[in-house]
Amino acid sequence: SVVADTVNVTDSPNCKSRLNSLLVASEIRRSGLDVILQLTGRDRNQIALESVLLGALSVGVNKVLCLSGDQPDKNGPVVVNEFTSNGLIKLCKVISRGTLTDGTKIKNPLPIFPGAADDLYDQLSKPESLSKLATKIEQGANFVQTQYCFEFDIIKEYSDKLSDEGSSNDCKVLVGMGPLKSAKQGDWMRKNLWGINISDDILYQLETSDNPIETGEKICKELIEKIIHLPCVDGVHLMGPNCEIGSARIISNFR
């Protein structure tokens, strides 16, 4: 049975070739589950991006997380980068209004709901980050998904900052987190993935646990219980590579 409200389909993360994200999103949508299609400007020019968005609408996928995309190493594949994440949000809005960028009219246009990514730690340490998020919201972002965060104090400070600025009034904010399976996994993530800060205390809980998988799920569940009533926190974006069953168990606690 369906547990999550929607699921994200990633777009060649870490700049590695993966199964076409729109194909996967289409199959999931056909099963009856709602989908958020992640779309990067890294690999596609304007024509290719418009084609993906039209294709998404044709199969009932109308939520798009607009990303710049992980960039390759110096000797990696050639990138396009014609569109930034901001540019992708604007493109979604143009298509929602019924035209392509060259003015071509779209028959029976449908709305696209673009989303933006955010990093809580950047928001709290770099004054310019809030204005960048505000710009994305002004350009039409309907929702925000943040990077992983496992610290209540950081999430509360982020929530208070958004509330004070009023910058998220017109969109939904989903805080990112996920069940960690081991201290080793958590340590690797904080060293290698953008925007992630996992405290030594959490790693210690996992390392000393007789059942680290259960402990990782418990950490998530308890954090969700603390943040669901914060202002400007509208939901949770659970990320659990190879932890889909654990993520489902966490969600089930709140149904």
List each language-model region with its residue ranges:
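Aromatic-anchored, glycine/proline-accented short structural segments
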Residues: 129-181
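Short, acidic/polar
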Residues: 1, 21, 46-53, 124-135, ...
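Catalytic beta/alpha-barrel core
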Residues: 6-17, 39-40, 65-66, 142-151, ...
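Structural motif
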Residues: 2, 59, 139, 230-231
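Conserved, mostly hydrophobic/aromatic
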Residues: 7, 56, 136, 140, ...
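Hydrophobic or amphipathic alpha-helical targeting/insertion segments
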Residues: 54-66
